[in-house]
């Protein structure tokens, strides 16, 4: 980055909060506002996707009312700090503070595991509705729906995002957690290669990684956007191969870990994860 660019960044940064505050009130349509889609519009969306619509709630909600908690409350208590379990819950974040919401008057909407506080269970920042995406067409249908209705859109794979961008109060969720496609190709050829090239793989919303071996051709594993590192490691091991990944096995392999640099145990030998993908498949939308 040039020095001029750095200086411009520091001069612009102080005015950003003021600009953002002016725009937030009318930025996106949120749940509970008159602009929110009605039941018929959500029914129409449901007919275009492969799975029923999600209605996420904070996982602690099964412990309420305190006078008659659900039988699932014991499961929540037993797995509350389990990263794999939390990634399986559409309404759970890895950092529970991102499930809460603080209003301008400093009141809080949250659902606490400690039911002795006497505070009612609230939705907090957990999206009230979403799409359980299993394919590229599911994702496209969800994005187009959000665009049509000007909804605040969030995407969650495992909920590890350190900035809490996997969730937002009153938003519309795309949950990619079940897009678990895994393919091993010992002679990988990227899509779009010359027609005479063999073994071309036509991806479906995936990320393709090198897997390491000593040969004169490219060997690769294709991972769906919902694959977690424990899935990827188990799959690569069955092929007798290794893949550069993160130390936390519950983190998504094709998400923020790659985009944020991707440091892992094999990085000193094979480099950062951001340099390993060789053929990401992206979806195009008309904005």
Q: Which role does the model predict for each range below?
A:
Residues 272-287:
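Active-site and channel-lining beta-strand-loop segments
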């Amino acid at each position: 980055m040039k020095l001029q660019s750095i200086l411009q960044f520091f001069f612009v940064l102080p005015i950003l909060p003021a600009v953002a505050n002016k725009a937030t009130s009318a930025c996106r349509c949120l749940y509970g506002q008159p602009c929110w889609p009605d039941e018929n519009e959500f029914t129409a969306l449901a007919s275009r996707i492969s799975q029923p619509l999600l209605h996420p709630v904070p996982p602690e909600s099964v412990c309420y009312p305190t006078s008659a908690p659900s039988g699932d409350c014991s499961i929540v208590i037993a797995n509350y700090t389990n990263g794999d379990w939390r990634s399986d819950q559409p309404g759970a974040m890895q950092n529970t503070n991102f499930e809460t919401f603080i209003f301008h008057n400093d009141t809080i909407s949250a659902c606490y595991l400690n039911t002795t506080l006497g505070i009612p269970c609230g939705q907090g920042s957990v999206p009230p509705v979403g799409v359980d995406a299993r394919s590229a067409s599911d994702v496209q249908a969800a994005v187009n729906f959000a665009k049509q209705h000007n909804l605040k859109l969030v995407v969650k794979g495992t909920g590890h995002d350190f900035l809490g961008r996997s969730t937002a109060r009153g938003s519309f969720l795309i949950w990619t957690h079940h897009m678990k496609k895994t393919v091993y190709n010992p002679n990988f050829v990227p899509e779009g290669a010359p027609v005479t090239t063999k073994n071309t793989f036509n991806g479906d919303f995936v990320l393709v990684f090198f897997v390491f071996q000593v040969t004169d051709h490219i060997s690769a594993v294709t991972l769906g956007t919902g694959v977690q590192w424990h899935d990827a490691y188990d799959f690569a091991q069955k092929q007798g191969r290794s893949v550069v990944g993160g130390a936390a096995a519950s983190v998504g392999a094709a998400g923020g870990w790659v985009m944020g640099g991707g440091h892992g145990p094999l990085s000193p030998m094979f480099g950062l994860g951001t340099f390993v993908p060789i053929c990401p498949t992206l979806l195009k939308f008309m904005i």
